[in-house]
Amino acid sequence: MIRYDKYDKMVWEGCKNKITFHLSERETEIVFYLFFKYEVEILTETDLIKKIVRDRRFKNVKSITTLDENYSLIATEFFCEKLKELKEKGREEDISELLDELESYMENITSSFSSFGSGEGYKSYTDPKKKLELTEKLLKNNKLKEFMKVLGKFKRMAIKKYKTKIKHFSGEKYSINLGNNLINLLSSEYKNFAEEILFVDLLRRYNENKPLNYKILENNENCGDFVVCLDLSGSMRGNKEIWAKAIALCLMDISLKRNKRYISILFDDGVRDIKIYEKKVSFDEILEFASVFYGGGTNFEKPLREALKFNGDIVFITDGECEVSLEFLEKIKEEKQRRKIKIYSICINTKPTVSLRQISDVSVTIYELTSKTAEKVFDMLI
């Protein structure tokens, strides 16, 4: 039994209808208080509760859920669903794996919530009513729930890959000037950190904006657009769709960080939607992207024709097979050569057709929809 007050009870009564009950309402309420309350005071300690509150992973989850009714609801539903499964298997006391899954799940969800629609100059949802509305959509939509989990996992992976690569700038030193940009500090200035007298002189020059800096001549690969053609034909329904959409959104985030426009082209047997993104997307846009699906046949030529209208490399994600006319193949080759652009194809559960191999600079076949294969894609594109 957990001690709770009138405020805790009021919060629970106000939001309990947002979740699916996998345990009894009373058991679910107790679990909610475990996650929601700032200080958990246990009146009657069972072996199960003792294992939960003393586990390091529970404390990590608490750092996310404490006094946040939305994250507490999400954690409660996930925990209760998994605990029910353990009970049915007679393994109720074996919660180590459950807490491990919960910690990973909450990290993925919070990463998805915070990665989009926030930050300076972008629309963010700090209004509790709006956040509760988004949480309710997440809890009632299993497809969206799975999508946000995969997206959060891939997002952290993509950002890590991006941060690793930007340590090695894609330019060259071409001139020296005076300035306070410590990132572009000339290597000869580093010796001044070792000697006290030289360090004092460096501080003086820093105050006067006079340390030696180098300018970077940016590589052309940082210019132009980044175009992603995403197949949403009937055969992409299910896990393929979730995996591919998560990849596409992660590539969007990295593209915008590089100050590239991100062009999204959704297609099946025709081009269904083209959107141009120049700033971070809102959470409503994420929900819309996660929900949209078309389900028709497959046509490669139409989306590729649209993609060539933009100025940048093209990523083509599909699980289908479709031939491209010889005339169009020649056009693509000419455009690639003239504009110095590349086409990357990601083929899910199918080998690329002859025509797709012909137009692609790199073709990757994905047989398993896992984090490992996602990393393979990020290695190629980030």
UniProtKB/Swiss-Prot annotation:
Per the record, GO CC terms? cytosol
Q: Which Gene3D superfamilies match?
A: von Willebrand factor, type A domain (3.40.50.410)
PANTHER family in alphabetical order: PROTEIN VIAA
Designated name of the protein: Uncharacterized protein MJ0077
Organism lineage string: Archaea, Methanobacteriati, Methanobacteriota, Methanomada group, Methanococci
